[in-house]
A protein has these predicted regions:
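Long hydrophobic segments that form regular secondary structure
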Residues: 42, 46-98, 115, 130
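Adenosine-phosphate binding glycine-rich loop
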Residues: 80-181
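Ser/Thr-centered flexible coil motifs
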Residues: 28-30, 65, 135, 155
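Alpha-helix boundary/interfacial micro-motifs
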Residues: 27-28, 33-35, 70, 99, ...
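Alpha-helical scaffold segments in soluble metabolic enzymes
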Residues: 1-4, 47, 51-54, 67, ...
């Protein structure tokens, strides 16, 4: 999906438990990994994170170290989405970076990435137009709608879920909360 949204494929490096998924690698490869193999000399997650602007973690607790986060580009965006424990916690990131934007899969941290924000609405839209598949255009429309919603002022009923603290778009609020009825 990120390629469909305009991310340059040559700037994307995928990793698995064996390291970087690169062109020519044979160990642990399959047709899906091969389709996204990078042309790179980078071989480890640690190397791949050096200078990176964004990292998406979908693995396990502890996969990202403070040193890896420190090595990223200025103002890095970190999606640490392993559940129940993210690859690195916001507290760990804050020890080494004061410029990071971070999201996790956990409701007790800011910027919870939760599929409940998209699934019911994407499915409702597909039903309404009698679509037989969910395509990238539908997913991108959902992404754009959520991004727009995060930039809007938060209504009183949503602010109540924050114990009266009204979130505003910024590093601590890039994703609407699941309680948001809009």
């Amino acid at each position: 999906l990120i390629k469909s949204m305009g991310f340059a494929p040559e700037n994307i490096i995928l990793c698995d438990t064996k390291g970087v998924i690169y062109q020519g690698r044979t160990e642990g490869m399959n047709q899906w990994k091969s389709a996204h193999a990078a042309k790179t000399d980078t071989r480890t997650l640690e190397e791949a994170m050096k200078g990176a602007d964004v990292v998406f973690g979908l693995s396990q607790k502890g996969a990202f170290s403070e040193e890896m986060i420190r090595s990223m580009a200025d103002r890095p965006i970190i999606f640490a989405m392993a559940n129940p424990d993210p690859e690195i916690t916001p507290e760990e990131v804050a020890r080494v970076r004061d410029d990071a934007i971070m999201a996790t899969g956990r409701s007790d941290y800011p910027n919870q990435v939760n599929n409940v924000l998209g699934f019911p609405y994407i499915f409702r839209g597909a039903l309404d137009v009698r679509a037989s598949t969910i395509n990238d255009a539908m997913k991108i429309a959902a992404v754009n709608a959520l991004a727009s919603l995060a930039r809007e002022d938060v209504p009183d009923d949503v602010a109540a879920a924050y114990q009266g603290n009204r979130p505003r778009f910024g590093a601590q609020y890039i994703i609407p909360v699941p309680f948001d009825p809009r």
